């Protein structure tokens, strides 16, 4: 029975261009959407720009534009990326559209009627010059623990201390430099801690989608959610109520009946999924409310692991208690790395999607490579340049494309491009084997196990190439009286090539369209693998795909950033300050030997709930136990990035009681004093062969 699907990807924040992580997610979702359409299902695939919030308002002001114009300019640059990588959204909208304003306010009113909205007074820093309340990211000052300057309003990146913004010494607004003052403000909260919400979410997160029968969430996601639900013996932890309001001036959607109050961007952003679909339906003359109320509709979201909390807790609770359908599935993926490392422009490991296209690299090389690394689990995808070249050249060109190129020419020259339906038993056995794989490959696409689907397709291609090598059409073409046999062998190859193209079409849509033209067939669906072409005429073969020139990879990776005048060798000779700050006063060797620096291996790492700066690290320092250290490196490293790495720790620093637990040391990292001009945070890592516990002397 045909399905009707509503599919989205996470909304990109409208303050910059797409990065490679966006493109990876769009490719993952686009493959799934194309597969569903090849199965005969109706799919509405929509996206939008996340257009609200203080960062956009401030960036627009600096650019001399209104927020609306700033967002519109960003949106105007989306098309080259989407078209270039064959991402087939049905609609692209903005969370600042009228549909989102209406839907967000309607959702709020429904939650308020349901008794899940309350208000309370909170204290915040206020910039008297800008006349606005300051989020933590716009407040800096001296750390109350170690005295380090220019630290953010919630934690110190030097000593790792966590504190309230009110504890900062000499605080200042990063917007104006003014000293902020404390002001109270009434804020609106969504009562996520309500027993009603908790009971619903426990059922929803553990449940299965009514139509597919599959779990709504992946096992890894469900395990993480269980951690968020957990409370200690004193009842601490668990889900907290959610502050959904911000004070004017703010670029966003006004809260009904609350002058000067706006929805926090994370309330209206996911509602943007619905708004984009409504915008599309209105343009198509379709009934949005009827579609969303239809029990046959399936709602599916593709997101990155960093926004799991919002999409698996806030979002379904908001929908359920405002009377709307909840998602059938939230599919979570990992991040993308380069050669096992987090991408970094300064280290020459950043991939610009637009540069990829501009230097002439085939978009479907990347689609294939990413698909060959993706599965249904929450795992990172690693882009390795050498592996990229080998997979594309060996699999796509060497195994798949070559099947057609080895057979089509003989059919055109000797048989006027006509295939024969009279195939011997050997050919029928080969083709029946390819046809029998259809359901398995379809199941793998459905489960987002793209890597397995492509491995199975390439294993089939290997069997076809073995058939070609065994029957040697190039030799048959030279032998008298072998025309019928030559036509059979070449027809078998083209039939097999067509079946493989069906299986690869969700990943390679542009190439598949070329193949459909070459084969003179209508757009192919998965069901078409159940039949053969038979006595059918094809067009003359034209080369379908070039091999990757490894030199293109050198051009792809952005070179390290050019040194600024302040840090260039010439400037250094003129007395530049190294690292942006003067050297500390001279100490004696006796002073230095008081510090016990040891090599440590990071055996585990996790985010610290309630902090945007800290990671909780578990360190092996060679003591026979693991130490816990809170380190302010979250801005540069995800937990998965650092697990297994060696680094340097101050081992004899007195344990420090912090809000989140006891920190037993300090991990050393390097950064420039002027982080705006010179962003980056770098762990100190020893050369290979090091073991935990070695002393740094």
Curated annotation (Swiss-Prot):
Annotated spans, Disordered: 557-577
Source taxon at top rank: Bacteria
Locus of motif 'KMSKS' region: 342-346
Motif 'HIGH' region per record, residues: 12-22
Residue ranges of every copy of the tRNA-binding domain listed in the record: 591-697
Cofactor annotation remark: Binds 1 zinc ion per subunit.
GO annotation (BP), single: methionyl-tRNA aminoacylation
Cofactor(s) recorded in Swiss-Prot or TrEMBL: Zn(2+)
Catalytic activity: tRNA(Met) + L-methionine + ATP = L-methionyl-tRNA(Met) + AMP + diphosphate
Binding site for Zn(2+): 143, 146, 156, 159
Main location, first listed in the record: cytoplasm
InterPro entries: aa-tRNA-synth_I_CS (IPR001412), Anticodon_Met (IPR041872), Met-tRNA-synth_bsu_C (IPR004495), Met-tRNA_ligase_1 (IPR023458), Met-tRNA_synth (IPR014758), Methionyl/Leucyl_tRNA_Synth (IPR015413), MetRS_core (IPR033911), MetRS_Zn (IPR029038)
Family annotation (Pfam families): tRNA-synt_1g, tRNA_bind
EC number: 6.1.1.10
Protein biosynthesis recorded as keyword: yes
GO cellular component, one term: cytosol
GO molecular function, one term: ATP binding
Chain sites annotated for binding ATP: 345
Keywords for this protein: Aminoacyl-tRNA synthetase, ATP-binding, Cytoplasm, Ligase, Metal-binding, Nucleotide-binding, Protein biosynthesis, RNA-binding, tRNA-binding, Zinc
Annotated localization: Cytoplasm
Family per record: Belongs to the class-I aminoacyl-tRNA synthetase family. MetG type 1 subfamily.
Function as written in the Swiss-Prot or TrEMBL entry: Is required not only for elongation of protein synthesis but also for the initiation of all mRNA translation through initiator tRNA(fMet) aminoacylation.
HAMAP family cross-referenced by the UniProt entry: Met_tRNA_synth_type1
Subunit structure: Homodimer.
Name used for this protein in its record: Methionine--tRNA ligase
Provenance organism: Methylibium petroleiphilum (strain ATCC BAA-1232 / LMG 22953 / PM1)
């Amino acid at each position: 029975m045909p399905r009707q699907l509503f599919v989205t990807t996470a909304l990109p924040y409208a303050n910059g261009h797409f990065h490679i992580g966006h493109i990876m997610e769009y490719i993952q979702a686009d493959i799934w959407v194309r597969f569903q359409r090849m199965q005969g299902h109706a799919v509405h695939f929509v996206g939008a720009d996340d257009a609200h919030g203080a960062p956009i308002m401030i960036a627009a002001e600096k650019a001399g534009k209104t927020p609306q114009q700033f967002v519109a300019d960003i949106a105007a640059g989306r098309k080259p990326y989407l078209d270039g990588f064959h991402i087939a959204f049905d609609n692209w909208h903005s969370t600042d559209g009228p549909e989102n304003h209406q839907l967000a306010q309607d959702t709020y009113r429904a939650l308020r009627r349901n008794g899940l909205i309350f208000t309370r007074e909170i204290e915040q820093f206020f910039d008297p010059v800008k006349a606005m309340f300051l989020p933590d990211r716009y407040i800096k000052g001296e750390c109350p623990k170690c005295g380090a300057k220019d630290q953010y309003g919630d934690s110190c990146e030097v000593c790792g201390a966590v504190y309230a913004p009110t504890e900062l010494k000499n605080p200042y607004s990063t917007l104006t430099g003014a000293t902020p003052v404390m002001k109270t403000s009434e804020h609106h909260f969504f009562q996520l801690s309500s027993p009603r919400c908790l009971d619903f979410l426990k059922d929803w997160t553990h449940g299965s989608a009514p139509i597919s029968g599959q779990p709504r969430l992946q096992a890894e996601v469900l395990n993480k959610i269980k951690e968020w639900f957990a409370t200690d013996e004193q009842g601490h932890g668990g889900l907290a109520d959610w502050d959904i309001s911000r004070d004017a001036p703010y670029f966003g959607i006004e809260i009904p009946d609350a002058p000067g109050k706006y929805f926090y961007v994370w309330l209206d952003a996911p509602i943007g999924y619905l708004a984009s679909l409504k915008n599309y339906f209105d343009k198509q003359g379709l009934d949005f409310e009827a579609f969303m109320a239809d029990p046959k509709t399936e709602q599916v979201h593709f997101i990155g692991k960093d926004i799991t909390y919002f999409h698996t807790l806030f979002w379904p609770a908001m929908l359920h208690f405002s009377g709307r359908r909840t998602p059938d599935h939230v599919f979570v993926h990992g991040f993308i790395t380069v050669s096992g490392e987090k991408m970094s422009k300064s280290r020459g490991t950043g991939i610009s999607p637009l540069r990829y296209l501009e230097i002439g690299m085939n978009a479907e090389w990347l689609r294939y490579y990413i698909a060959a690394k993706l599965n249904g689990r929450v795992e990172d995808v690693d882009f390795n340049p050498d592996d990229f070249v080998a997979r594309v050249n060996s699999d796509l060109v060497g195994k798949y494309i070559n099947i057609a190129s080895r057979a089509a020419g003989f059919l055109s020259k000797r048989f006027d491009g006509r295939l024969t339906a009279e195939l011997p038993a050997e050919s029928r056995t080969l083709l029946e084997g390819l046809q029998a794989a259809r359901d398995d490959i379809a199941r793998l696409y459905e489960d987002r196990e793209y890597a397995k689907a492509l491995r199975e397709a390439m294993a089939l291609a290997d069997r076809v190439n073995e058939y070609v090598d065994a029957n040697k059409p190039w030799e048959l073409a030279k032998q008298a009286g072998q025309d019928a046999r030559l036509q059979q062998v070449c027809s078998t190859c083209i039939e097999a090539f067509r079946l493989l193209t069906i299986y690869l079409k969700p990943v390679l849509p542009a190439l598949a369209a070329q193949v459909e033209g070459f084969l003179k067939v209508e757009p192919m669906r998965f069901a078409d693998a159940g039949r053969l072409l038979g006595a059918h005429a094809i067009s003359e073969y034209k080369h379908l795909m070039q091999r990757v020139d490894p030199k293109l990879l050198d051009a792809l990776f952005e070179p390290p950033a050019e040194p600024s005048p302040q840090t260039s060798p010439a400037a250094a000779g003129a007395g530049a300050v190294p690292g942006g700050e003067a050297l500390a006063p001279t100490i004696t060797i006796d002073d230095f030997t008081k510090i016990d620096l040891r090599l440590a291996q990071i055996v585990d790492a996790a985010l610290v709930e309630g902090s945007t700066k800290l990671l909780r690290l578990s360190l092996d320092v060679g003591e026979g136990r693991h130490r816990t250290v809170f380190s302010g490196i979250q801005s540069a490293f995800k937990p998965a990035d650092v697990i297994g790495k060696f680094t340097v720790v101050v081992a004899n620093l007195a344990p420090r009681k912090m809000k989140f637990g006891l920190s037993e040391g300090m991990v050393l990292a390097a950064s420039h004093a002027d982080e705006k001009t010179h962003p980056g945070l770098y762990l100190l890592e020893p050369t290979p062969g090091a073991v935990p516990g070695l002393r740094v002397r």
